[in-house]
Amino acid sequence: MNPVRIVAIALGIGAAAGGPAPDLSPATQILMENGSPYYVPATATVASGTPIRWDNPTPTHHTVTHNDCVTEAHPCLFDSGTVAPGGHFTVPGLPAGRYPYHCGIHPIMRGLLVVTDDRSTPSQL
């Protein structure tokens, strides 16, 4: 058998047995702003498992904090800590649900992430 064919067969077997493929979906981008609506878009809709990335193009520090992080009654699903100017924060994906969030430094900054079970749902920004 040709050595090239053996390598091709081995690679094919390795790819088939390698487990689930990583989600290579592009992240949905949300921008942090210093003025209203503060998070752009203010409400973002994505399919479950889709990565979400918040970018901070402002000259000010911000956070992205799930509202449940301020109570002990529910789990805190994401909290960026301080995101410096020019920085970003990414959540690899969330299960279906509604996730209100805010900036812990500037409480007037609020956003909503809506995650659907439908993988065919395009990111709605």
State each model region's role.
Residues 1-7:
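Bacterial N-terminal signal peptides that target proteins for export
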Residues 17-125:
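Extracytoplasmic copper-binding redox domains, predominantly the cupredoxin/blue-copper superfamily
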Residues 7-16:
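Bacterial N-terminal signal peptides
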